[in-house]
Structures are given as C-alpha cells and as structure tokens.
Amino acid sequence: MSIVTGQAHRDGVLAQLPEFASSDNRTLLIEPTGRDSMAAIGLAAYVVRERFGEDAIVGSFAADHLIARPELLRDAVETAIGAARDGYVVTIGLTPTEASTAYGYIAPGPALNDGDEAGAADAERGARRVAEFVEKPDADTAARYVAADYLWNAGMFIVSAGVLASHLARLLPDMHARLETIARVWGTPAFEETLAENWPHLTKIAIDHAIAEPVAADGGVAVVPADAQLGWTDLGDFEALTGIVTEAGNLGEALRVDSDGAAVFASLGDDSEGPLVALVGVPDVAVALTPDAILVTRRDHAQSVKAVVDQLAEQGRSDLL
C-alpha cells in the first residue's frame, strides 16, 4: 500500500499509521508541493511499476471518503481488477442518492463484451464502457443525469501500472519521462533530490482530464457500478462532516439551544476540546475552531469555503492554509 500526501500532513499520517515509517510493503510518498491528482497518482503508480513490473494493478482512492459497507467496495474493486487486467482504465461509479451539483457524473455505455471471452466475463461482473465523463452540473442537468442512470464520479481508478504509463507517455510525454526518472531511483539516496528537481515541472492536472476523459473517448475506460447500499460519503466539506458529527456527537464541547443540525469542530493542537461553544437559534451551522482561526458557515454554504481559502492564498496567509 502507498500513501501520497503533502509535507504538512506527513507527521499526522505517521501518527495514525506508524507502520508506514519503515516497511517494505507500505510506502509513504511526500509531494514537495501540490500538483493535482495526476502527479500524485502517477508518482505512486510509477514507483509500483518500478518495483513490481508493468502488470501490477494500482488503485487510487481518496483519503476523505467514508464507506459504511467496505465489503461492497471490495466487491466492486475485484470486478474492476478483472477489467484492468484486460487493459482498461477502470473507475468505480456510485449510484446517486440525490441530484447533487457537487460531483461530476459518468455516463455508462454498453456492457464490456467485444466478442471475446475476457470482455464477456467483465460484462457478467457488471463492468461497462464509459460513454462520457461530465463536469459538475447545475441542478436541472443533475436531475436529468440521475433520471438517465448516470453515476457519480468519486475519483476512484484501477488500472495496470503499464497501461497507465502507456497512456501518459502518449498524452503527456514530458510528465511520463520525469515520473520514470523519479521512480528509477526509488529506494536510493538520490530519490529525494531527483524528486525535488523534477516535481515542479510536472503538469498540474487532474487524472480525469489527463487520462480518463481522452481515453474514454477512445473506448478505453470502463466503469463498475458499486452496490447502491455502499453508503459512500465524501467528507470533503463541512456539510458532510456535520452530518456525521451530529449523529456521533460534537468534536468539541458544545451546548445547543434551538440549533438542530449544528456542529462544533475543535482542533487546538494540544488534545484539548477548547472553549465551550454555545449555539442558540442557529440551526444547521458548522463552527470550526483552531488555535489561530475560527470558521462559521451554514451547512448549505459549505462548498463556498473554498472562496475563503482562495482569499487567504491571495493575501499570502500560508500560515492559515
């Protein structure tokens, strides 16, 4: 297993998963800077390819997904591995629970069955060609997608290391060459220096745009619909986090009066819960406290928190990011 994360999260990852500090079977890869998902996934995939060969199957999964029934995800991944061994880039599609505008969508095409035995086997297990990836839609378009049995794109990809490298060599040859250069010195004293030299030159692009969309246009991407009972939650915003916290209790000391659906998140860096937060007449809000900042937002505005992050970046407040 490999984890790719930024320098700021290194100590936190090792505190939760100390076995990654020194293990032949577990690898912690630290990005010098954020270069979007293609660079992060590519780094891990090319190191796996260097260590285990072209046929090694790699899967990429975000760390901020909550899965209520992981056994159903395992079933989908097993199906995806079969299609990946047949040369497809495979993604896991999720059955929408609402007409959300927060996620991209996948238009599933026909079942994988090119007249060969492998294609028929993949089709029997539920794998389908991807007809199209579509960006986050407006509300009306999202409703049409759900009615047409589109799937949510959760950004989970399974592919052989060699197939990924061949697509990247064709579509982004400079990135391919630099990732090969980095992976070639994995496990040697030259790795950190080689990573630092090449990393800033990698194209900053999501894997969806770099590989998934163009390869899907050529018929090379498959989707495996996960079971509708999977119980998937994207914990990428306070709307989702608040939904979890209000069921499990606040992550901080809070007193709520006429404030149903509100939640408090406290992280003061010293294992303390921080001050008592009293919420009166403010339902469905999220309050986050850190040692140097406080955020208050309505749950239905959770997606807009990115605007605060952008403003802080423009002001050079890297200490708060």
Describe these PLM feature segments.
Residues 1-62, 67-72, 94, 300, ...:
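Conserved N-terminal catalytic core of the sugar/cofactor nucleotidyltransferase
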Residues 5, 61, 137, 159, ...:
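A conserved hydrophobic position in a structured secondary element of the catalytic/binding core
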Residues 21, 50-53, 59-60, 67, ...:
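Solvent-exposed alpha-helices and their adjacent loops that cap or buttress functional pockets
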Residues 27, 129, 222-224:
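Conserved beta-strand segments of alpha/beta enzyme cores
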Residues 34-39, 98-100, 139-140, 231-232:
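A short acidic, often aromatic-flanked loop/helix-cap motif at beta-alpha or helix-coil junctions
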Residues 44, 64, 106, 160, ...:
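Residue-level signal for inorganic ion chemistry
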Residues 70-198, 219-220, 299:
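Conserved core of the sugar-phosphate nucleotidyltransferase
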Residues 162-321:
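Left-handed beta-helix
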